[in-house]
């Protein structure tokens, strides 16, 4: 199976596969990320927004879903209903498999989802839409609309001074460096981009439904 967003950017997807081996990401990792971008932030501020987002996710009506870009299952257990967790990273999916909720996992490509038309009610995508280039976003959105009635996107907010999009250099524990494309969002702008409406507009997190 090809990488979730294709083999044309192996550095990005190899980074996330390798990172999954290092374990789940924490609020501490998020704080380090924002501080690395020059953002003044505290652990409690990020925790408060993350808690609001999780509560919003849990309050959604239960429904069949596909979680695209599930990673190591950061939000999988919060999703109401029943469905599958999909990611390009086998390492990440091993973490999801070992979790207590028992969500089935599928390794696959976000641009070619291995799901029949209108098979589920919801596609949930957390911190993946902001990794897609312009060329990758179009097929992802088309696939999400093909298989589901609703698309819910959770992604990174855009505090003052943070670029809307740029290439980042990420380093893992072993010292290896990767180039990763990243976008940061205003909730209203993201909603307009995917023909949706904002559910949460924070400094560090945004959540939109379409």
Label every PLM stretch briefly.
Residues 119-121:
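N-proximal accessory regions
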Residues 113-117:
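Short amphipathic alpha-helix with an adjacent loop that forms part of the alpha/beta core around
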Residues 143-144:
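Class I S-adenosylmethionine-dependent transferase superfamily signal
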Residues 124:
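A conserved beta-strand element that flanks and buttresses the S-adenosyl-L-methionine
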Residues 2-65, 71-112, 132, 136-139, ...:
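Class I (Rossmann-like) S-adenosyl-L-methionine-dependent methyltransferase catalytic domain
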């Amino acid at each position: 199976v090809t990488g979730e967003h294709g083999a044309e950017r192996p550095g990005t997807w190899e980074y996330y596969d390798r990172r999954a081996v290092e374990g789940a990401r924490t609020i501490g990792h998020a704080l380090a990320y924002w501080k690395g971008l020059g953002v003044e932030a505290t652990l409690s501020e990020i925790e408060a927004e993350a808690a609001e987002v999780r509560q919003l996710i849990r309050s959604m009506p239960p429904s069949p879903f596909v979680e695209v870009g599930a990673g190591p299952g950061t939000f999988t257990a919060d999703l109401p209903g029943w469905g599958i967790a999909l990611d390009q990273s086998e390492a990440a999916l091993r973490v999801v498999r070992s979790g207590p909720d028992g969500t089935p996992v599928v390794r696959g490509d976000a641009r070619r989802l291995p799901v029949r038309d209108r098979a589920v009610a919801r596609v949930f995508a957390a911190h993946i839409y902001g990794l897609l280039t312009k060329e990758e976003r179009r097929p992802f959105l088309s696939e999400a609309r093909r298989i589901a009635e609703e698309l819910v996107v959770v992604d990174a907010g855009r505090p003052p001074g943070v670029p809307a999009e740029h290439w980042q250099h990420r380093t893992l524990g072993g010292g290896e460096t990767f180039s990763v494309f990243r976008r940061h969002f205003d909730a209203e702008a993201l909603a307009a981009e995917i023909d949706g409406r904002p559910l949460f507009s924070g400094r560090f997190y945004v959540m939109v439904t379409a």
